[in-house]
Amino acid sequence: QARRDAEALGVSPALAESLLQSLIRGSLTTQEQARVASQGRGSGRSALVIGGRGKMGHWMADFLAAQGFAVTVADPSGEVAADDYVADWKSSDLHHDIIVVATPIRIANAVLAELAGRRPRGIVFDIGSLKTPLRSGLEQLRAAGCHVTSVHPMFGPDTELLSGRHVIFIDLGDAAALAEARALFGSTMADLVVMGLDEHDRLIAFVLGLSHALNIAFFTALAESGEAAPRLARMSSTTFDAQLDVATRVATENPDLYFEIQSLNDYGVESLNALQAAVNRLCRSVQEGDAATFVAMMQQGNEYLRERQAARDEASR
């Protein structure tokens, strides 16, 4: 309706739609943030965020503070405004209701294992993008009798509105810890999904690993195109521009984190092998003039993507 009204007034329909979507998102963001704050789940309770100077650690600290938690950030990088601070979490008494491990993946397992030795009374969970590298630390916490689960917010630190976003919770056998972690996001509009540890990393190998690898290959091919590079900067197409927008965002992300996501996942090689096989098949079909294979690949992809969209539409009803 907005597009039709705009067109009747001589205004760009695309501009009108974009403006209306921005207004709706702004309104939903305000409503969601007000609901999170009003429920006050953290009133009279405390939380420790280990690695709270990192981007997602900072987001988590702010998210908990908005719910009324008294938040302490532990990070050797320096203090964070508006939060209590300790440089080293080991100096804390760990008498917190919630302990969040938001360190880089490569050191998170060691932190979890050390926490197991301290046996904190509160709920402990990490927010890492991968779970198989943390398996032993999580198991040590369980064996020590700690309340532990694992969480993966499927969005970046600049996210304000959680509507349409997913938060994954790993069921480690502690129903109380799982319920408490889910309750933290219960007042948001995020989709909350529970799954097993290995299932998570198998899926993440494709959801993150494959999409990252595809975009890294895309912008690497462009960057190494030689004299074509400056000419490409002056050309565009709908498909190229859309892919370039995604690749540009990927290129600005933390390369160390992206390498961890590729290299530390026990199931990561599956998606890379699948990508390599698909590219090799595509190349062979073109080089050998095999139109049937090329067409079959596109038809298979079209069918898969239509079925995926139908499943998403059904799930959102």
Region spans (language model):
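N-terminal hydrophobic or amphipathic helices and topogenic motifs
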Residues: 1-46, 67-70, 77
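Hydrophobic/small residue at the entry helix of a nucleotide-binding pocket
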Residues: 56
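NAD(P)-binding Rossmann-fold cofactor-contacting core
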Residues: 59, 66-83
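Short acidic low-complexity segments
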Residues: 77-95
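Rossmann-fold NAD(P) dinucleotide-binding segment
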Residues: 91-141
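Rossmann-fold dinucleotide-binding core
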Residues: 130-191, 195, 201-204
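Active-site-proximal catalytic alpha-helix in oxidoreductases
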Residues: 165, 178-179, 184, 200-226, ...
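Interdomain hinge/lid region at the active-site interface
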Residues: 231-305
